[in-house]
C-alpha cells in the first residue's frame, strides 16, 4: 500500500530552537486508527507517516506555566483563517497545561473541514493554488503574559 509522508515542522518564533517541547508538545493523531502517529526525525525535521484517505488531527499540549497562542497551519494554510500561513496571523489561545485538538480548518464557529492524508493534486492547498507547503504541519507558539489588574485608589 502506498503511503504518504506528512512533514511536521515546529517553528518556535519566540524562543530558541533548543526549547522545542518546553512551550508545547505537538502530535498528529490518525482519527481512523485512534492513535498518535510516531515521529521519525531526519536531518532536523520531524516526519509522520499517514495512510491515504485517513483523517487526522493536530494536538497541541501547552507545557508552559502560562497561556500560549498557537498559530497552526496545515499544508501552508492557517487552520483558523484559511489564509496562506504566516506567523503573525491569528490562532488559538491554549490555557496553561491544557491541550487543544484541531481536527480541521475552521469554516465557522461550529464547522471544520477535516484534515486527511491525500495525494498532492487532491489537497486543498494545491486546489487553491498554494501547493508549495503541502505535507507541512507548522506551529508558531507565543507565550502570553497576563496583565495584572489593580484597583485604583
PLM feature spans:
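Intrinsically disordered, low-complexity segments enriched in small/polar residues
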Residues: 17-152
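Sec-dependent N-terminal signal peptides
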Residues: 4-15
Amino acid at each position: 500500500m502506498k503511503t504518504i509522508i506528512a512533514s511536521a515542522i515546529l517553528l518556535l518564533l519566540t524562543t530558541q530552537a533548543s526549547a522545542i517541547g518546553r512551550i508545547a508538545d505537538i502530535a498528529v493523531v490518525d482519527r481512523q486508527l485512534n492513535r498518535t502517529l510516531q515521529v521519525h526525525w531526519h536531518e532536523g525535521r520531524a516526519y509522520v507517516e499517514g495512510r491515504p484517505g485517513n483523517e487526522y488531527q493536530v494536538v497541541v499540549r501547552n507545557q508552559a506555566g502560562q497561556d500560549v497562542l498557537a498559530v497552526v497551519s496545515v499544508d501552508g494554510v492557517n487552520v483558523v483563517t484559511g489564509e496562506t500561513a504566516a506567523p503573525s496571523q491569528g490562532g488559538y489561545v491554549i490555557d496553561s497545561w491544557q491541550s487543544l485538538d484541531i481536527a480541521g480548518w475552521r469554516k465557522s464557529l461550529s464547522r471544520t473541514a477535516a484534515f486527511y492524508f491525500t495525494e498532492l493534486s487532491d489537497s486543498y492547498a494545491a486546489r487553491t493554488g498554494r501547493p508549495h507547503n503541502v505535507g507541512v504541519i507548522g506551529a508558531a507558539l507565543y507565550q502570553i503574559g497576563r496583565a495584572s489588574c489593580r484597583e485604583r485608589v
